Design a protein with these regions (language model features):
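Metal-ion/cofactor- or nucleotide/acyl-coenzyme-handling active-site neighborhoods
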Residues: 1-228
Length: 228
């Protein structure tokens, strides 16, 4: 009943729980991010389209090709890339994070109701930066202590403040700009169903269960037809 756009880091987590995304996106150029694709989930990967920024780390495409996963490379509006005259393949803006990239792709595919899940963009009360089954959790040790008190912002629901980081603050501000722009000019409604973390201005905050019961009322014919 929903189209699922999944960030690279969430892909192995969704696979672990048997939740199949329609699109998995990635834009990082570091080998650490490529490791999210160093796996073989077999039949689970059938009909998933992996959408990659055109200059991801080479290991990303190597791992995807190894298991014959279906992927495409897309480019942003960078001057150098446009000078190469690959206009036939098209471009789209991607923002600074894979979450921003996913959000922009939903707009280009003309979705009108967008549900955000897992976009905390803030530390949890226990200081953790990601879910406990996030693969690279150890890489963020000490970050909460480093950022505490420096990047506080309004909490989800409007009750009090939460601790954030410089990068998350940047991602949130980009989100807010895109959300308000698409609402104003394209009548796109964005729901934040994260149920925690930072408030993302311009979204409608609702529990995820509410979104499932009120927005997901039509079965979708998957896999989707290929666009020309």
């Amino acid at each position: 009943k929903a189209t699922i756009f999944c960030a690279d880091s969430s892909y192995p987590i969704l696979a672990k729980h048997g939740i199949k995304p329609d699109y998995v996106l990635s834009l990082e150029r570091i080998p650490l991010t490529s490791e999210f694709f160093n796996n073989d989930f077999g039949e689970f990967d059938k009909d998933i389209l992996f959408v990659l920024k055109s200059y991801v780390h080479p290991h990303t495409t190597k791992y995807l090709q190894k298991n014959n996963r279906n992927f495409m490379l897309v480019s942003t509006y960078a001057s150098f890339i446009q000078y190469l005259k690959l206009d036939y393949f098209g471009y789209f803006n991607m923002g600074k994070s894979v979450a921003n990239m996913s959000y922009l792709l939903t707009e280009y595919l003309n979705y009108k109701n967008i549900i955000l899940i897992g976009q905390d963009l803030a530390y949890a009360k226990d200081g953790f930066s990601h879910t406990k089954d996030y693969k690279n959790l150890d890489k963020h040790e000490g970050h909460f202590q480093r950022d505490k008190g420096k990047f506080q912002c309004l909490a989800y629901g409007g009750n009090g403040k939460v601790e954030s980081s410089e990068i998350w603050t940047m991602f949130r501000l980009i989100f807010e700009n895109d959300i308000n722009y698409f609402q104003k000019f394209f009548n796109i409604t964005t729901y934040n169903c994260t149920e925690g973390g930072a408030r993302i201005e311009g979204t409608i905050e609702k529990p995820f269960l509410w979104a499932c019961e009120n927005l997901l009322d039509k079965d979708l014919n998957k896999p989707f037809e290929k666009l020309e």
